[in-house]
């Protein structure tokens, strides 16, 4: 009820201004009596995935806390894990504004943010300071001005810098808002990326004396043969997990709605069915070789359960959280 009242005011603001205001307030309220507005004490529902113990299987998807500024606040809401980023080697401002749009009648969001972030070094400092007893995933990407043929270098730079501080590392090659990025999902480009990531992971595991899992985040807009090839590569290179899915370019579910024709990736309820289909197909292809983290349109316990029945061992929320608030986390954790 409280969030529904607050949302009415928040949704009168420009979407990105509302996001920035929320981040500022979470930073301001954290650790003060005012965090009572979002703090939730949830029952422990521990699971072990990728060799990591999670307090519960519900996580915050990347993109909401790009710079790792509010990790404790999201932890206070009951998330079992928080994925920060996407972060790049160097700071970048992202695409021109406006670049974030609500499709309220569909409970969807279109974004073309373009990996706006303060850089990996800033993120690492925030993660180091965070007092959170859950799992922190760090989502990494490439800078827009890095040629795609040199993109792997950006991932390796970020991986080296975040390795000590990450519970797991997510490799984002599926955002539609960085030109050419999705080409890394295919063929030799994918194999080259995965092989170099595994080599770097082995090197860093020996250096720091701990093994940090690596998960690949993929798009929903993949043909079956493309999905099959990705699954084969994930198994071949012994990648630790896969996150399915990122945002979609498909607009068939939102035709005629305000903002539907805006460029960018569509998330929220409109991508729910397709992302679940990808999870289900991945499970068929992967078997028990590696776990799936399901994300895309999860806006209720029922939607989370659908992802898990399809084959996901963990779930993440973002757009559903924007529309439903912290109560969504409670709903899923209590009923899972």
UniProtKB/Swiss-Prot annotation:
Pfam families: DHO_dh. Gene3D superfamilies: Aldolase class I. One of its GO terms (molecular function) is dihydroorotate dehydrogenase (quinone) activity. It catalyses: (S)-dihydroorotate + a quinone = orotate + a quinol. One of its GO terms (biological process) is 'de novo' pyrimidine nucleobase biosynthetic process. The active site is at residue 175. Its main location: membrane. Binds 1 FMN per subunit. One of its GO terms (cellular component) is plasma membrane. Substrate binds at residues 66, 111-115, 172, 177, 246-247. NCBIfam families: PRK05286.1-1, PRK05286.1-2, PRK05286.1-4, PRK05286.2-5, pyrD_sub2. Belongs to the dihydroorotate dehydrogenase family. Type 2 subfamily. This is Dihydroorotate dehydrogenase (quinone). It comes from Aliivibrio fischeri (strain MJ11). The gene is pyrD.
């Amino acid at each position: 009820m409280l969030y529904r009242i607050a949302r009415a005011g928040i949704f009168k603001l420009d979407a990105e201004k509302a996001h920035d205001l929320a981040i500022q307030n979470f930073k301001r309220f954290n650790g003060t009596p005012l965090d009572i507005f979002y703090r939730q004490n949830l029952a422990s529902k521990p699971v072990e995935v990728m060799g990591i113990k999670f307090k519960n299987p519900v996580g915050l998807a990347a993109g909401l806390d790009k710079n790792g500024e509010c990790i404790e606040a999201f932890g206070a809401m009951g998330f079992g894990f928080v994925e920060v980023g996407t972060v790049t080697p160097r700071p970048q401002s992202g695409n021109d504004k406006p670049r974030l749009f609500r499709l309220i009648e569909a409970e969807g969001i279109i974004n073309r943010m373009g990996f706006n972030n303060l850089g990996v070094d800033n993120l690492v400092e925030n993660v180091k300071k965070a007092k959170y007893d859950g799992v922190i995933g760090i989502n990494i990407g490439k800078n827009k001005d890095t040629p795609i043929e040199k993109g792997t270098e950006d991932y390796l730079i970020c991986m080296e810098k975040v390795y000590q501080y990450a519970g797991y590392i997510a490799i984002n090659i599926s955002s539609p808002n960085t030109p050419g990025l999705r080409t890394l999902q295919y063929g030799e480009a994918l194999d080259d990326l995965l092989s170099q990531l595994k080599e770097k992971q082995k090197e860093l595991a020996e250096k720091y004396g701990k093994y940090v899992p690596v998960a690949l985040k993929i798009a929903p807009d993949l043909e079956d043969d493309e999905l099959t090839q990705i699954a084969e590569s994930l198994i071949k290179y012994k990648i630790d997990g896969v996150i399915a899915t990122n945002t979609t370019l498909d607009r068939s579910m939102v035709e005629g709605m305000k903002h539907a024709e805006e460029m960018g990736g569509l998330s929220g309820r409109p991508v729910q069915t397709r992302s679940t289909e990808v999870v289900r197909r991945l499970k068929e292809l992967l078997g028990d070789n590696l776990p799936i983290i399901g994300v895309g349109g999860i806006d209720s316990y029922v939607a989370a359960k659908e992802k898990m029945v399809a084959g996901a061992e963990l779930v993440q929320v973002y757009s559903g959280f924007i529309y439903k608030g912290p109560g969504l986390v409670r709903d899923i954790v209590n009923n899972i």
